Curated annotation (Swiss-Prot):
Highest taxon in the source lineage: Eukaryota
Gene3D superfamilies in the cross-refs: 3.30.70.100
Reported induction: Up-regulated by cadmium.
Organism: Arabidopsis thaliana
InterPro entries (UniProt xref): HIPP (IPR051863), HMA_dom (IPR006121)
Protein name in UniProt: Heavy metal-associated isoprenylated plant protein 14
Record lipid sites (S-farnesyl cysteine): C123
Length: 126
């Protein structure tokens, strides 16, 4: 079943009867929206059996079918194609190479105050 737009003319003179008519129509499955004027015109939109709705409403008040139309889906305008956006990906930052901590050179040397010159007795100059 396709969605229909039905306009009904109701002879309603009291607010209480108007509320009962709205509740009666809203109980049908497939009803999308219901609007009602003060003049008594009720507009029903949805996938609903219109003669069944009229039969229920005739138990409350005098009801006439004014028009029944198929609901046309709204025409979508084709959207202009957007140019592909260039996505700027973040540049991965390389961390500087982490060197091991430098250790102090630790070698032992004699202090300069203890140095002495040794004359070798083997050397003979004649």
């Amino acid at each position: 079943m396709t969605a229909k737009n039905a306009v009904l003319q109701l002879s309603i003179h009291e607010e209480r009867t108007r509320k009962k008519a709205l509740v009666t129509v809203s109980r049908f499955s497939g009803v999308t929206s219901i609007t009602m004027d003060k003049s008594g015109k009720m507009t029903i939109v949805g996938e609903v059996d219109v003669p069944a709705v009229v039969m229920k409403l005739r138990k409350l008040c005098n009801t006439e079918i004014v028009s029944v139309d198929d609901v046309k889906p709204p025409v979508k305008k084709p959207e202009p194609e957007k140019p592909a956006e260039s996505i700027a990906y973040p540049v991965p930052m390389n961390y500087a190479y982490q060197f091991n901590p430098a250790y102090a050179n630790s070698y032992y040397h004699q202090p300069y105050g203890n140095c002495r010159v040794v004359d070798e007795p083997n050397c003979v100059i004649m």
